[in-house]
Design a protein with these regions (language model features):
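Conserved active-site and cofactor/substrate-binding residues in soluble primary-metabolism enzymes
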Residues: 15, 19, 66-69, 99, ...
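Short, hinge-like loop/turn segments at secondary-structure boundaries
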Residues: 11-13, 77-79, 104-105
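Generic secondary-structure signature for well-ordered alpha-helical cores
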Residues: 22-29, 76-80, 110
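Short, acidic Gly/Pro/Ser/Thr-rich loop/turn segments
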Residues: 2-3, 67, 94-95
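Conserved anion-binding
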Residues: 1-37, 56
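Short, well-ordered secondary-structure micro-motifs
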Residues: 5-10, 45-48, 71-73, 97-99
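Non-catalytic structural scaffold of enzyme domains
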Residues: 93-111
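A C-terminal functional module that forms or caps the active site or interfaces directly
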Residues: 34, 39-88, 92
């Protein structure tokens, strides 16, 4: 949320977010990836095209669990790029405590 103003700023016709994604695609798989929050409005950031076009690079997606994104909605949020997503729900896991982590992981697997 703190970086919204920067990430939605325009560099020519595209947002900074879209430009970063384009650069990551040029570098290619294996050398670069992007971070896209699972709770972000992709339209606002000018990157809604990731739902219809596979980015071809890994996407680290924080925001699952405690921040509100549901693993079951991963494909809706990321569309054609969803196979590239590494969902992150570390806050939910640490908040669950050591006695509940295994149960939370099992529940998360069922959502996928």
């Amino acid at each position: 949320p703190e970086a919204t103003e920067l990430q939605t700023a325009k560099t020519g016709k595209a947002t900074v977010s879209a430009t970063v994604i384009e650069l990551a695609q040029k570098i290619g798989l294996g050398d670069c990836g992007v971070v896209i929050g699972a709770t972000q409005d992709l339209d606002q950031f000018g990157i809604a095209h990731i739902r219809t076009t596979d980015l071809g690079v890994p996407i680290l997606a924080p925001g699952f669990g405690a921040q509100g994104a549901k693993l079951a909605s991963l494909k809706d949020q990321f569309g054609a790029s969803s196979a590239r997503v590494i969902p992150n729900m570390s806050r939910a896991l640490t908040m669950a405590g050591p006695d509940s982590v295994a149960k939370l992981i099992d529940k998360a697997k069922l959502e996928l």
